Swiss-Prot record:
Swiss-Prot/TrEMBL cofactor(s): pyridoxal 5'-phosphate
Enzyme Commission number: 2.5.1.47
Protein name: Cysteine synthase
Gene Ontology MF terms in the entry: cysteine synthase activity
Domain of life per record: Bacteria
Keywords: Amino-acid biosynthesis, Cysteine biosynthesis, Pyridoxal phosphate, Transferase
Similarity section: Belongs to the cysteine synthase/cystathionine beta-synthase family.
Keyword Lipoprotein: no
Catalytic activity: O-acetyl-L-serine + hydrogen sulfide = L-cysteine + acetate
Pathway field: Amino-acid biosynthesis; L-cysteine biosynthesis; L-cysteine from L-serine: step 2/2
Organism: Clostridium pasteurianum
Quaternary structure note: Homodimer.
Length: 15
């Protein structure tokens, strides 16, 4: 799981 910070919203992406 890679957590990317987009703006102020933490989005969890499955890679």
């Amino acid at each position: 799981n890679v957590t990317e910070l987009i703006g102020n919203t933490p989005l969890v992406e499955l890679i």
